[in-house]
């Protein structure tokens, strides 16, 4: 999977950009604030329908403009697609695949599997469980065709149940929901557990390469006692849940935990080690997708040089090159990119929203 061409209009300081990319490495250099991260953000938005920088879309649309537009030409093996996304200032989103309206953001996300590596991405390891659930659910979204619909239904039922609890309704009013909720909770949790176990060998192999001095172990926790039937637990805990106003236990509390030499990684690893572990996890997940589904991820890496020494940068670049994936990397100077020791690709200079291709 690769983006061969990208058109960006009215997206932050990228007023009118039309670029052709290499299917391997694409390097973006320029001063801070020049627009390097904005280009990564535009690519991410095309594949997710949201930003990794701002939750308010109006801040992304160029000043005094009614909308922004993204268009990409996508290639995978012998197949080609055109994808487009337009975000209006009043909030509407229009998504197109091969010129056809009526597509959902999930359709774009399925077509464009992406892995994002940023300095803020350490929340995967030192943030709350929701970040690690999202990590698992990303993989399941691309591995199980029915996962997304089950996940949406599960969250809808949880929202309805929590609303009923906060309104102090009796158990008889929500019992019918709990039957379906329990069924979906077990299905989603089983999928998560299976995926976590399937991913374990790739994680251990990649961590051994990046952090050979540490023994990294992983464990999945489904959000309630493993031996307990979830429907029974909902009934048992109803009075407690009603008193609190929301459902305390369940798949919405699941976690995927990481330890280094038996201790939580967020307590014992340096920021550099945490970044290496984050990179290892993203690479392992991308490689697992390739092994299982024969699909390449697109890797977006912002501020490549931060927290990593020269040896680790070269090691990461080597693994990315071996993966055969398309990679977008930002850095301040071309010298930082030379340390990656990548012989081919494309180099772009970004200067206040203007992007020029240079000789690599």
Residue ranges and their predicted role:
Residues 72, 326-332:
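Structural recognition of the conserved hydrophobic beta-strand(s) that form the central parallel beta-sheet
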Residues 45-57, 284-292:
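Post-Walker A helix-loop "phosphate-sensing" segment adjacent to the P-loop in P-loop NTPases
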Residues 121-210, 221:
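An accessory alpha-helical subdomain
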Residues 302-304:
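Walker B catalytic acidic pair
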Residues 36:
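Conserved lysine of the Walker
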Residues 48-131, 137-147, 200, 204-205, ...:
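Nucleotide-state sensing region of NTPase/ATPase domains
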Residues 1-31, 172-298, 307-311, 315-326, ...:
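Conserved NTPase motor "head" modules and their coupling/switch loops across ABC/AAA+ ATPases, GTPases
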């Amino acid at each position: 999977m690769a983006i061969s061409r990208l058109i960006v209009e009215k997206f932050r300081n990228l007023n009118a950009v039309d670029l052709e990319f290499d299917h391997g490495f694409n390097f973006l250099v320029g001063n801070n604030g020049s627009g390097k991260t904005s280009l990564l953000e535009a690519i991410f938005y095309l594949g997710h329908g949201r930003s990794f920088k701002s939750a308010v879309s109006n801040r992304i649309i160029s000043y005094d403009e009614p909308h922004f537009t993204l268009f990409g030409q996508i290639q995978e093996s012998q197949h080609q697609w055109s994808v487009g996304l337009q975000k209006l200032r009043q909030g509407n989103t229009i998504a197109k695949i091969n010129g056809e309206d009526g597509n959902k953001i999930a359709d774009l996300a399925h077509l464009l599997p992406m892995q994002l590596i940023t300095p803020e991405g350490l929340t995967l390891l030192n943030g709350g469980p929701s970040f690690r659930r999202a990590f698992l659910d990303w993989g399941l979204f691309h591995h199980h065709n029915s996962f997304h619909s089950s996940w949406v239904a599960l969250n809808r039922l949880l929202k309805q149940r929590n609303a009923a609890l906060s309104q102090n309704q009796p158990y008889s009013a929500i019992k019918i929901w709990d039957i379906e909720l329990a069924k979906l909770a077990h299905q989603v949790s089983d999928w998560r557990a299976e995926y976590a176990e399937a991913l374990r060998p790739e994680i251990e192999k990649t961590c051994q390469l990046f952090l050979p001095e540490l023994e990294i172990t992983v464990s999945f926790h489904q959000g309630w006692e493993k031996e307990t039937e979830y429907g029974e637990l909902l009934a048992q805990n109803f009075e407690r849940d009603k008193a609190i106003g929301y459902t305390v236990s369940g798949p919405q509390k699941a976690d995927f935990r990481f330890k280094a030499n038996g201790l939580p990684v967020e307590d014992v690893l340096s920021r550099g080690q945490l970044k290496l572990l984050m990179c290892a996890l993203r690479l392992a997940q991308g490689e697992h997708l390739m092994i299982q589904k024969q699909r390449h991820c697109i890797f977006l890496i912002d501020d490549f040089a931060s927290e990593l020494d020269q040896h680790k940068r070269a090691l990461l670049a080597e693994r990315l090159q071996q993966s055969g994936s398309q990679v977008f990397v930002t850095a301040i100077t071309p010298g930082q990119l030379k340390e990656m020791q990548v012989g081919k690709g494309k180099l772009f200079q970004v200067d206040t929203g203007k992007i020029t291709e240079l000789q690599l």
